[in-house]
Amino acid sequence: MRVLYLLFSFLFIFLMPLPGVFGGIGDPVTCLKNGAICHPVFCPRRYKQIGTCGLPGTKCCKKP
C-alpha cells in the first residue's frame, strides 16, 4: 500500500503544470519585464514569440 502512495505522489508531481511553460505571457507589463517587446501582427526577424501582449494580434517577441 505504501508503494501506491509513492506512485500517486510521483504522478501528481510529474503531471502538474509548470509555471511559465503552459501559461505564457498575456500582458504588456509582463512582456517588458521579461526583456521582450510588443509587436503588432508578427515578430521581427531574429525574434521569437514568447506570448501575447493582451490585444488581439499583438505578439510578445524576444531575441533567443
Curated annotation (Swiss-Prot):
Keywords: Antibiotic, Antimicrobial, Defensin, Disulfide bond, Secreted, Signal. GO terms for cellular component: extracellular space. Belongs to the beta-defensin family. LAP/TAP subfamily. GO terms for molecular function: CCR6 chemokine receptor binding; chemoattractant activity; phosphatidylinositol-4,5-bisphosphate binding. This is Defensin beta 4A. The gene is DEFB4A. Monomer. Homodimer. The keyword Translocase does not apply. One of its GO terms (biological process) is defense response to Gram-positive bacterium. It holds the Pfam family Defensin_beta. Disulfide bonds join C31-C60, C38-C53, C43-C61. Residues 33-48 are annotated as: Phosphatidylinositol 4,5-bisphosphate (PIP2) binding. It comes from the Eukaryota.
